[in-house]
């Protein structure tokens, strides 16, 4: 997982020389396995009750994300209340849960040269909550474990905490005068497990012009390993659509998998 984050971080920098690559790698190395673990053990804990869209546990999750960005002095997105939350009402037809209040979380690190062009990193902040609708576990339907919490450590706690670490690394780079050329948007979307609803809401109500959005990299379930590989080669970067979006990104990911 850490290798995946490093390669994503390097891809978002623009390199004009080997020395610039070295500087980018320096900030990439601030991403540590321990910090990822610390975040994930909180974010996927029982306290957050599986982060079901609109539920109390999901509200705790968005507060955790907001507090992280505040503590790291990373600005909120261009929202009316400057509070990191893009609020919405969603009709959750899956599971007949009705209408709920929920929110995307949006933060930004502004670009140094082309601030009006945007790279968007996304992950979904929600999971399925307690083991009923949307659960693949047969145990969730049997006896006393019917209300089992589904913590969503990989789906998508892994992508969520990865974005936090990437944002922190970019903020440190910016403080040293080595920030990204284009603005980077950190968009944590809600309602993914209910049908990509938070993503659809942002697409219909974009905070930043879609025509100025250069690309979107989505981080989902990146805590897996490749069981066909052995030893220290089991970490594997798998980027869907990279050959369509950027041949350079595709080539870089393939080269990294050979290491």
Write out the residue ranges for each language-model feature.
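Bacterial Sec-dependent N-terminal signal peptides
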Residues: 1-23
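Second-shell loop/turn segments in exported
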Residues: 22-30, 46-56, 91-95, 144-156, ...
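N-terminal capping segment at the start of a domain
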Residues: 25, 30-60, 72-76, 85-87, ...
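Structural recognition of the beta-strand scaffold that forms the well-ordered cores
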Residues: 39-44, 78, 86-87, 104-108, ...
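Solvent-exposed loop/turn segments at secondary-structure junctions
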Residues: 47-50, 69, 75-76, 92-95, ...
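A non-catalytic alpha/beta surface segment that caps or lines the substrate-entry region
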Residues: 51-109
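Alpha-helical metal-binding/catalytic segments enriched in His/Glu/Asp
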Residues: 105-107, 121-127, 132-194
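Metal-dependent peptidase/peptidase-like ectodomains
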Residues: 114, 189-259
């Amino acid at each position: 997982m850490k290798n995946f984050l490093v390669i994503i971080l390097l891809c978002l920098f623009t390199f004009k020389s080997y020395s610039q690559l070295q500087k980018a790698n320096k900030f990439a190395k601030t991403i540590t396995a321990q910090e990822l673990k610390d975040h994930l053990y909180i974010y996927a804990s029982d306290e957050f009750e599986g982060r079901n869209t609109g539920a109390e546990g999901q509200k705790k999750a968005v507060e955790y994300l907001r507090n992280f960005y505040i503590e790291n002095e990373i600005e909120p997105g261009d929202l009316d209340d400057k509070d990191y939350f893009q609020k919405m009402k969603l009709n959750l037809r899956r599971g007949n849960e009705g209408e709920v209040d929920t929110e995307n979380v949006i933060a930004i690190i502004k670009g140094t040269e082309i601030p009006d062009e945007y790279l968007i990193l996304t992950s979904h902040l929600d999971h399925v909550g307690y083991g009923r609708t949307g659960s693949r576990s047969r145990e969730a339907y049997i006896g006393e474990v019917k209300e089992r919490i589904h913590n969503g450590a990989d789906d998508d706690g892994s992508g969520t905490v990865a974005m936090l670490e990437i944002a922190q690394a970019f903020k440190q780079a910016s403080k040293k005068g080595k920030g990204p050329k284009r603005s980077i948007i950190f968009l944590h979307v809600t309602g993914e497990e209910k049908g990509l609803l938070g993503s659809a809401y942002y697409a219909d109500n974009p905070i930043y012009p879609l025509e100025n959005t250069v690309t979107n990299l989505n981080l989902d379930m990146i805590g897996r390993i490749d069981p066909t590989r052995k030893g220290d080669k089991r970490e594997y970067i798998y980027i869907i659509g990279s050959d369509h979006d950027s041949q350079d990104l595709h080539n870089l990911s393939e080269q990294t998998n050979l290491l």
